């Protein structure tokens, strides 16, 4: 028994900031950003537009795409590292916005790997036969964590949300397999925020060692994917679309090169979305689905890495 995606939806705030606009108040330029990251623009939420609002917009699109009633949902999981409040959870607020009562809802925090983590958790819950329809969301207001004086990080991130509706599969479609990992030994030497509720009462700002993260991303995502391929007796040629975490075009291209995944199979949205953390994969999936390219039976590969470090991959048959 496994879960399948029956609907998806993405939402990006209306405000778009190009590299040239960013260069007006940050010591950077369009060429510097594009050549190092592949990013040309990012969407930025307004001051009163919170993660829960982004989540709601994407959830409504996913519900409509799935053709279900909101009342069919019996569990909500929101993957985020930028909640509106310390508590309640974004998922709880979203449940209220949707008018749902007496169903469980919770947030899952695995940063950029959140959606892959959430997919495995949701699949386990559907496989338990306790839940039939799960709303799984990746939603982030990453710009709230940026130090706009640090050009090595502030140029990388954007805001947005992506949602999927999951139900039990009655055929061979759905989640084929997934793996998730973490390693917290050297978190403060790679990627973290310099604050937190129990540390100093503030959320802090993103601190990142880019070269170290690049090396870890290539090594760990590549091994995660190879493990899945081996475990399921798949070859790279079986993959129809590769949807990696949209962190940096160099990471995406290097992974595709090392794994011998053909260029036309690699989904890239980092140029327009920037790094939306847990929202990046479901946003990219929604973009791909809207293009009309996916057909039934296609094999999709998701893979992500985030702070922690957390990482993992998943195979889905559409």
From Swiss-Prot:
The keyword Lipid biosynthesis applies. The active site is at residues 112, 245, 275. GO terms for cellular component: cytoplasm. Residues 246-250 are annotated as: ACP-binding. It comes from the Bacteria. GO terms for molecular function: 3-oxoacyl-[acyl-carrier-protein] synthase activity; beta-ketoacyl-acyl-carrier-protein synthase III activity. Its EC number is 2.3.1.180. It is found in: Cytoplasm. It holds the Pfam family ACP_syn_III. Keywords: Acyltransferase, Cytoplasm, Fatty acid biosynthesis, Fatty acid metabolism, Lipid biosynthesis, Lipid metabolism, Multifunctional enzyme, Transferase. It catalyses: malonyl-[ACP] + acetyl-CoA + H(+) = 3-oxobutanoyl-[ACP] + CO2 + CoA. Pathway: Lipid metabolism; fatty acid biosynthesis. It is an enzyme of class 2 (transferase). Its main location: cytoplasm. One of its GO terms (biological process) is fatty acid biosynthetic process. Gene3D superfamilies: 3.40.47.10. Belongs to the thiolase-like superfamily. FabH family. Catalyzes the condensation reaction of fatty acid synthesis by the addition to an acyl acceptor of two carbons from malonyl-ACP. Catalyzes the first condensation reaction which initiates fatty acid synthesis and may therefore play a role in governing the total rate of fatty acid production. Possesses both acetoacetyl-ACP synthase and acetyl transacylase activities. Its substrate specificity determines the biosynthesis of branched-chain and/or straight-chain of fatty acids. Homodimer. The last Arg residue of the ACP-binding site is essential for the weak association between ACP/AcpP and FabH. This is Beta-ketoacyl-[acyl-carrier-protein] synthase III. It comes from Rickettsia rickettsii (strain Sheila Smith).
